[in-house]
Regions:
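An acidic intrinsically disordered interaction segment
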Residues: 23-35
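A short alpha->loop->secondary-structure connector
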Residues: 14-26
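Short beta-strand scaffold segments in enzyme catalytic cores
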Residues: 4-11
Length: 189
């Protein structure tokens, strides 16, 4: 997650890795509990259809914070940013901001677990984007992995999927540049 939510699949078994782009960030948000259904209803009133990207991007952190602000009768500043919410949680210990990041991690983990069940990436599931490196401490706190593994009878299968956090925020851009370079080589060969 970053400004949006991108999803791709990589087949790295051959000599030349193949990348399959998707629009996976635009699948429907799938609430995991009653509280998340309330979040879905809240965002449905604002946006109509609610994709998972409405939660898992910078604006998504703000959306969750907005919902929790209304739920707990706190004033909501419509100008607040995801970075400010993260700072409130990480540096100032603000309980609403901390709860926002907990919700974000649970939703992120559940979505990643759904992707893992769909694609079975036994070589690893890689988390990238602008937000992931900024929330490494939150990733380590367990909410993400707990939600990732909360898949009923399929939970044991997901124990075989390693999850990696990529700290380089430019990895997507570097991959696109590499792809472009390879395409140029093929065109001139």
């Amino acid at each position: 997650p970053g400004t949006g939510l991108g999803v791709c699949l990589v087949d790295g078994k051959s000599d030349h890795s193949r990348v399959f782009a998707t629009e996976g960030g635009h699948v429907d948000f799938s609430p995991a509990n009653q509280e998340q259904f309330e979040l879905l209803r809240f965002l449905n009133r604002i946006y109509g259809r609610v994709s998972i990207e409405r939660m898992l991007c910078g604006k998504g952190i703000v959306n969750i914070y907005h919902f929790l602000s209304e739920r707990y009768h706190h004033a909501f500043d419509p100008e607040i940013t995801a970075a400010e919410i993260s700072a409130l949680a990480q540096k100032e210990g603000d309980s609403l901001a901390k709860q926002t990041l907990t919700w974000f991690m649970r939703i992120y983990g559940a979505f990643a677990g759904n992707l893992a069940l769909t694609t079975l990436p036994f070589g690893g599931l890689y988390l990238a984007g602008g937000i992931t490196p900024k929330l490494l401490d939150e990733l380590k706190q367990g909410e993400f992995m707990q939600a990732f593994l909360y898949k009923g009878r399929m939970s044991r299968l997901l124990l075989n999927v390693p999850v990696y956090a990529i700290s380089d925020t430019k990895v997507g851009l570097q991959g696109a540049a590499m792809y472009g370079y390879k395409q140029l080589q093929l065109a001139t060969a």
